[in-house]
A protein has these predicted regions:
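Short, structured active-site "lid" loops
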Residues: 46-66
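Local sequence-structure signature of Cys/Sec-based thiol-disulfide redox active-site neighborhoods
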Residues: 1-28
Length: 80
């Protein structure tokens, strides 16, 4: 599987849910916490075509979207 990056914040329930799903599947990912690294927020918004909410999830260079989209991939068997 291509590298996964997930932009998060420390207090985001959807971020915790997305990370929990990835952890349960044994998938490694790079977490970018925009509260700890606020300078990365602009990068996230640019990469996510203007989306400013977290989580924003990328698999390789493809923008997946947020938590709902990640769970949709899981339901359709595309995270395996």
């Amino acid at each position: 599987m291509q590298p996964i990056e997930i932009y998060t914040s420390s207090t985001c329930g959807y971020c915790f849910a997305a990370k929990r799903l990835l952890n349960q599947k044994g998938v490694s990912y790079a977490e970018i916490n925009i509260q700890m690294e606020p300078e990365r927020r602009a990068e996230m918004i640019t990469r996510a075509a203007g989306q400013s909410s977290v989580p924003q999830i990328f698999i390789g260079t493809q923008h997946i979207g947020g938590c709902d989209q990640l769970f949709n991939l899981e339901r359709s068997g595309k995270l395996d």
